[in-house]
């Protein structure tokens, strides 16, 4: 059975960069765990803001967090009130000086993580999984994607036995290193159980 390597990890240092950028000697594991906790906290708190990615940079006791969001207005809040509250809460929780930078995701239809979350939201609302997948794929292609592949696994449509279904349009060359492929996952927690959603979006080849 063919296994898929993680498309982002496969291209690290070639087309993709790391989401955590810092250097550590003895506290490495502790800081990796802290990064994970920061990401989980931000994604849970700003769930409705469409968080695509959270990048973290560290220097001494300072942590710079860059949040990529489809709805910056929700994150920033009125006169920056929401972002200031978030910064203070993070400082209190992690005992470090926190700087937050907000970046807008201009085309959320081409962000694999946001597409996956959109599909999972539709599955929770009991939209037919094939319709949800096809709608997301056609929207991404309309906004300029060269190819899209979506896979869903679990008790699809409330079926007794779990299964995996996928849908693809265009080409998604997973083994071509110069191919710019965005990959994202999401989990739809339905009344029948969890359904995993994976999305691959091919945006074109980046020539050296």
From Swiss-Prot:
Question: A GO BP term, please?
Answer: translation
An example of a GO molecular function for this protein is: rRNA binding
Keyword annotations: Ribonucleoprotein, Ribosomal protein, RNA-binding, rRNA-binding
May I ask which residue range the UniProt record assigns to the signal sequence? Answer: none
Q: What Gene3D superfamilies does the record point to?
A: 3.30.300.20, Ribosomal protein S3, C-terminal domain (3.30.1140.32)
Keyword Aminoacyl-tRNA synthetase on entry: no
- Annotated KH type-2 domain ranges read 38-106
Question: GO terms for CC?
Answer: cytosolic small ribosomal subunit
Under the heading SUPFAM superfamilies, the entry gives: Prokaryotic type KH domain (KH-domain type II), Ribosomal protein S3 C-terminal domain
Q: What does this protein do?
A: Binds the lower part of the 30S subunit head. Binds mRNA in the 70S ribosome, positioning it for translation.
Instruction: Note the subunit structure.
Output: Part of the 30S ribosomal subunit. Forms a tight complex with proteins S10 and S14.
Family per UniProt?
Answer: Belongs to the universal ribosomal protein uS3 family.
Q: What is this protein called?
A: Small ribosomal subunit protein uS3
